[in-house]
Amino acid sequence: MHGILSPGAWAFIAYVLGAVALCLVMLGLGRVLGGRSHGRAKNLPFESGVDSTGSARLRFPVKYALVAMLFVIFGIEMPFLYLWAVSVRENGWAGFVEVALFVSLLLAGLFYLHRVGALDWSPERRRRKPRD
């Protein structure tokens, strides 16, 4: 007669408990054996012996955030295209039409971003105004 849990479940529970116990032991040893220093220099950043000057908070233009978002959006297309490429024979013409539609939507988005100036890094005075 088997108990409520199978032997595999007991092994999994033992594994999780062991991992948690190992983490707690390592955290506890670090707390007990770690040195403590209190003072004004404790909260200063370490700069290889050089005294830091100025603020560490730099302001980045919004363009960097825009480029990061565009990279994420257009970078997501690669796994989809790869999955289509490895299964092109199984998908047939229906898969080809779907991928063609997907790529055309991405290209339309890219042309739109170019038209509104999201990809233009030139200074404001040299920018070309979009035609309406």
UniProtKB/Swiss-Prot annotation:
The keyword Membrane is annotated on this UniProt entry: yes
Keywords: Cell inner membrane, Cell membrane, Membrane, NAD, Quinone, Translocase, Transmembrane, Transmembrane helix, Transport, Ubiquinone
Coiled-coil residues: none
Protein's membrane topology: Multi-pass membrane protein
Catalytic activity: a quinone + NADH + 5 H(+)(in) = a quinol + NAD(+) + 4 H(+)(out)
Single GO molecular function: quinone binding
Enzyme class: translocase
Ranges annotated as spanning the membrane: 9-29, 66-86, 93-113
Entry's EC annotation: 7.1.1.-
Family affiliation: Belongs to the complex I subunit 3 family.
HAMAP family documented for this protein: NDH1_NuoA
Name of protein: NADH-quinone oxidoreductase subunit A 2
Source species of the chain: Pseudomonas paraeruginosa (strain DSM 24068 / PA7)
